[in-house]
Amino acid sequence: ASMFKHDHYMDNGVRYPNGDGICKQLNETKCDAGFSYDRSICEGPRYWQTISKCFIACGIGQRQSPINIVSYDAKFRQRLPKLKFKPHMEKLKTEVTNHQNRAPEFEPEDGENLYVKLNNLVDGHYKFHNLHVHNGRTRRKGSEHSVNGRFTPMEAHLVFHHDEQTHFEPTRTKLGGAFPGHNDFVVVGVFLEVGDDGFGDEPDDEECKHILKGHHPDNNENGNGDNGNNGYNGDNGNNGDNGNNGYNGDNGNNGVNGNNGYNGDNGNNGDNGNNGENGNNGENGNNGENGHKHGCRVKKAKHLSRILECAYRNDKVREFKKVGEEEGLDVHLTPEMALPPLKYRHYYTYEGSLTTPPCTESVLWVVQKCHVQVSRRVLHALRKVEGYKDGTTLRKYGTRRPTQKNKVTVYKSFK
């Protein structure tokens, strides 16, 4: 996330490290200077601090992000709040554009109307700033954060910026007191997996027009509570937890995650799974960490998946555009589409930085423990977005910053 519309780094030429692997510090002071994810050049992640004096934190900061989260080292805090939004489930009209060699951002036209609710954790109100998704040079390693050294193909970031116009200041839960002052940003990180089943056929152009306007043929993904009829995604579906045919229902007779569910509350291996935390498929696998109370269930984010797929395929986003020449694509979405169901929003939290220059160290990270799945087509479409004048796509260098070696304290909302 960044507050700037950066230039393209190739506009000013490309520099290479000398024989000793050192890049000369430039006298530039611009905070919107261009940067790259190409690790072989001086504009790449290892040398971002040499591009501009505004980027100095990228090299000497003490709380740089992203990090590798070691789950058993994270400290449990009992009073950490649940992650909610105000107003709940509001659909926003956003605009997404080609961001050159960076992750395309979905920016709300009226973001001040949506706030993240983390009472007892943050001071003041934080309004929605953008949603974007990071990818890697390889299909398997695209998330910026990792947990116990494990990455996912993508990572979604929901960025919230402190609203100085409001004066609501709840009591703050102290996270160790290592860093003074308040944070300018709250960024919610969500690990995105990819799959093939349950996402339907590839939408055509006509269907994409309706999808991007917020019209979905299946409106049960975030339906009417735990006990409705035929909920698509358990908690938020119409038939949710006790649905007879709930897709992810905890006790759904025919649910994919029902009695013998992949990560269901009554999954075969629950609390004491044979393989503990790192079951057959890792923290969110068949033998998940805690089965019921603090376990995970991978949500199939069908609506988000189709929105992202259609947006990344659209010429306004896919084709390379210089700053000032980009065309915005209107997209209707709900930020909660990118999150696990409410009862599975267990998270890690720490005080870190933006993961793009200027690497500002004023971010409270809220990294979701439970993963969300989107169609494999989303990953393919994102990797085909053009980031360079010659048509080179985001597939070549990705849009992820390598994990940083800071010693920051990580807390968690679950045992």
Curated annotation (Swiss-Prot):
Cell location: Secreted, Extracellular space, Extracellular matrix
GO MF annotations in UniProt: carbonate dehydratase activity; zinc ion binding
Cofactor: Zn(2+)
Lineage top rank: taxon: Eukaryota
UniProt binding sites for substrate: 355-356
Chain ranges passing through the membrane: none
Catalytic activity reported: hydrogencarbonate + H(+) = CO2 + H2O
Binding, Zn(2+): 132, 134, 157
Xref: InterPro entries: CA_dom, CA_dom_sf, Carbonic_anhydrase_a-class, Collagen
Location of the region described as 22 X 3 AA approximate tandem repeats of G-X-N in the Swiss-Prot/TrEMBL record: 225-290
Sequence repeat ranges per the UniProt record: 225-227, 228-230, 231-233, 234-236, 237-239, 240-242, 243-245, 246-248, 249-251, 252-254, 255-257, 258-260, 261-263, 264-266, 267-269, 270-272, 273-275, 276-278, 279-281, 282-284, 285-286, 288-290
Function comment: Acts as a negative regulator for calcification in the shells of mollusks. May function both as a calcium concentrator and as a carbonic anhydrase required for production of carbonate ions, which are assembled to CaCO(3) at mineralization sites. Is important for shell formation in both the calcitic prismatic layer and the aragonitic nacreous layer. Shows inhibitory activity of crystal formation when present in free state but, when attached to the insoluble matrix, may regulate the form and size of aragonite crystal.
Note: Two hypotheses for calcium binding are proposed. Either the Gly-Xaa-Asn repeat domain bind calcium or sulfite and sialic acid provide the necessary negative charge in the N-glycan to promote calcium uptake.
Family per record: Belongs to the alpha-carbonic anhydrase family.
Quaternary state and interactors: Homooligomer; disulfide-linked. May also be disulfide-linked to insoluble organic matrix.
Name of the protein in question: Nacrein-like protein F
